[in-house]
C-alpha cells in the first residue's frame, strides 16, 4: 500500500465546514473495545490516558484497532507527558490532546514535542505510523506537521486568561475545553457544573477566540443531547459521553426493558 495522506482527519477538523465531528471517548484499556465502538458512526475515537488506564502498549494497539476499523484515533496524554505525545504519533495517532495547558510556555513545549522542525523538535521514528498509512518516510516527514494535530486543553482559570496567547502559538492546531474542570476552577472549587448557561457563555467566547486565530474548537459533552447542543453552538469536534457511561446505560436499558416486559 502506498499512501498520500495520514487519514484526512486533520484536514476535516481544520476545514470549519465538517458539519461538526462526534468522537467516541474510551478509558477502558482494551484495543478490541476500540474496534467495537469504532464500528458505530463516530467520526473518530479518543483514547484517554489521563484518567483512563491505558499504557503505551495498549494505546498503540488501540490506535491500530481504530485504524483497522477505518477511524482516526486521537489520544489524550497524561498531564505534562510530552514525550508520550511523540511516541503516540509514532504509533499512528492522528492527533494528541494535552491536558492542563495553562500558559504559552506549556503550549510551546507541547508543540515542540509534536511537530518536526521548523515548528518543533519532534524526534524521528514513525515506523508504525508509516505502516498504518502506507506513507513513505519522505512523504510522512513532509506532511506530518499538517496532517497530525496538537490540541491543548483549556480547563483552568490561568488557561482561560491566557487563551489568546496559547492560541497564537505556532504548531498548536486547536483547543479542547474541559468544562468539568473549568467549572470547578471558575467556582474556586465550589461546584461541578459543566452544562450551565454560565458555562455556555464561556464556551461561546472560546469558540470566538478560536475563530479569530484560525484554529478549531473541541469540547467534552456529557451525553448525546449535550453533544448536539455543543455542535449547534459551533464546536468543530465534540465528545458524546464516555465509554463507561455508554456501556452502563446500554446495560441498564436492556435490564429495564426485560423487567418491563416481564411485568406487563
Positions of PLM-derived features:
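Expand to "…catalyze enediolate/carbanion chemistry for C-C bond making/breaking, isomerization
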Residues: 1-264
Amino acid at each position: 500500500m502506498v499512501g498520500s495522506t495520514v487519514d484526512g482527519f486533520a484536514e476535516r477538523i481544520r476545514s470549519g465546514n465538517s458539519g461538526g465531528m462526534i468522537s467516541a471517548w474510551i478509558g477502558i484499556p482494551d484495543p478490541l473495545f476500540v474496534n467495537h465502538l469504532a464500528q458505530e458512526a463516530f467520526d473518530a475515537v479518543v483514547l484517554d490516558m489521563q484518567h483512563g488506564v491505558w499504557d503505551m502498549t495498549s494505546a498503540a494497539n488501540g490506535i491500530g484497532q481504530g485504524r483497522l476499523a477505518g477511524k482516526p484515533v486521537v489520544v489524550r496524554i497524561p498531564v505534562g507527558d510530552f514525550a508520550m505525545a511523540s511516541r503516540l504519533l509514532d504509533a499512528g495517532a492522528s492527533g494528541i490532546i494535552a491536558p492542563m495547558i495553562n500558559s504559552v510556555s506549556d503550549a510551546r513545549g507541547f508543540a515542540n514535542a509534536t511537530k518536526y522542525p521548523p515548528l518543533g523538535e519532534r524526534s524521528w521514528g514513525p515506523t508504525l505510523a508509516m505502516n498504518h498509512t502506507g506513507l513513505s518516510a519522505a512523504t510522512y516527514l513532509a506532511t506530518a506537521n499538517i496532517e497530525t494535530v496538537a490540541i491543548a486543553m483549556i480547563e483552568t482559570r490561568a488557561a482561560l486568561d491566557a487563551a489568546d496567547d496559547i492560541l497564537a502559538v505556532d504548531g498548536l492546531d486547536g483547543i479542547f475545553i474541559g468544562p468539568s474542570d473549568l467549572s470547578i476552577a471558575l467556582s474556586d472549587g465550589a461546584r461541578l457544573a459543566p452544562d450551565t448557561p454560565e458555562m455556555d457563555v464561556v464556551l461561546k467566547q472560546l469558540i470566538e477566540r478560536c475563530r479569530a486565530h484560525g484554529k478549531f474548537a473541541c469540547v467534552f459533552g456529557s451525553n448525546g443531547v449535550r453533544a448536539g447542543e455543543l455542535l449547534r453552538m459551533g464546536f468543530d469536534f465534540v465528545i458524546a459521553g464516555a465509554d463507561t457511561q455508554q456501556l452502563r446505560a446500554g446495560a441498564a436499558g436492556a435490564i429495564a426493558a426485560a423487567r418491563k416486559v416481564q411485568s406487563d
